């Protein structure tokens, strides 16, 4: 593998992809980020058996190839590089990183042992990236931080046609936000539970794009997945198992008293 890529593009792509690298990986290869050079692009991928990240950026590829390197180490190196084009080249069991006068050598890990990333489910619709990030920020603060109650650390996503509702509660607080989105099927009706931390990270990281594509696995699928894609970045996550508490009934259908409060 041999290629040249813009320094800022590489640093941003590696930083985003390495977010999914676990701090304490159950197997050594999961500490790596997979790099694949093909055609005119560099594809970066990471996976921790729950959340996957896939990012494709433009690159001048001289020689196709695949290599696996430490994700956190590569991210640290990419941030420290000068503002010049970056050359990546596999040399035996090492990966040489050159940028201006800077030179680094990374040990190549066993790329053949790296697990295959989950397949992105069929697209269900799109939503404005900034609207999604704003709504997730307003709702996720009400999710529990207690990992012994995985249901309450998650955000309930309800889809009914062009309406998308996010809900979260920690038993003391409750937040709900309704959004309008563009479903691929206007008769779509489904629910999903996703960890608040994962949803928050995804929403924040995709705000540079106009629209975010949302995909949910069908009920007949072997595993329950949700996927998000925008601007050459794609991430999938396993959904939380279980039935979310029926918190909607806590909101009255009508009230006799209304008040408007300023936020400034």
Question: Where are these predicted regions, by residue range?
Answer:
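Structural preference for solvent-exposed beta-strand-turn elements
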Residues: 1-264
């Amino acid at each position: 593998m041999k290629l040249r890529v813009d320094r800022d593009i590489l640093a941003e792509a590696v930083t985003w992809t390495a977010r999914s690298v676990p701090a304490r990986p159950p197997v050594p290869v999961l500490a790596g980020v997979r790099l694949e050079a093909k055609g005119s692009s560099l594809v970066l991928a990471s996976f921790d058996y729950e959340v996957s990240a896939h990012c494709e950026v433009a690159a001048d590829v001289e020689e196709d190839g695949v290599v696996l390197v430490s994700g956190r180490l590569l991210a640290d190196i990419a941030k420290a590089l000068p503002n010049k084009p970056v050359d990546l080249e596999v040399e035996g069991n090492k990966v040489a990183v050159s940028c201006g006068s800077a030179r680094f050598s990374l040990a190549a890990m066993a790329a053949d042992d790296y697990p295959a990333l989950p397949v992105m489910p069929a697209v269900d619709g799109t939503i404005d990236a900034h609207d999604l990030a704003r709504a997730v920020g307003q709702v996720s603060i009400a999710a529990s931080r207690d990992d012994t109650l995985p249901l309450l650390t998650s955000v309930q996503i309800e889809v009914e046609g062009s309406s998308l509702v996010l809900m979260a509660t920690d038993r003391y607080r409750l937040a709900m936000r309704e959004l309008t989105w563009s479903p691929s099927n206007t008769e779509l009706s489904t629910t999903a539970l996703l960890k608040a931390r994962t949803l928050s990270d995804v929403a924040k990281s995709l705000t540079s794009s106009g629209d975010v594509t949302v995909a949910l696995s069908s009920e007949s699928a072997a595993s329950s997945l949700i996927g998000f894609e925008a601007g050459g970045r794609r991430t999938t996550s396993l959904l939380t198992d279980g039935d979310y508490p029926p918190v909607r009934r806590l909101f009255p259908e009508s009230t006799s008293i209304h008040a408007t409060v300023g936020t400034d």
